[in-house]
């Protein structure tokens, strides 16, 4: 990353109380390209990962899908756990549409605010809750047993 981009981020970091760039890169596993607008690139990298979680983890569990696993996974979570996931889902959808608006109408200040808001939501809610769900589903699959019922027709 160019020193120009780094200094630009540092300036915005101080102004908007943004997370350390290295923390963002490590958490969301991305590298920055030299010639890109730094906030657009950071926003795009973060949004790609968060929205992937939505599509691969949250949506199938709360809404179902055509996959065989969803039939079981929906039953592995309680109504309360599914409601928590839906509440997170709504917050991520807000981020998604704010992100879409920033793609249509780029604004560096709003992009910086979006990064901060997303970072806080990730650390305060998303990561912890999704980790719990992943652990629970993994454990549930590990202990899942088919019940064999033999129905005898006595008619």
Regions found by a protein language model. Give the residues of each.
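Long, low-complexity or tandemly repetitive, helically biased scaffold regions used
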Residues: 2-155
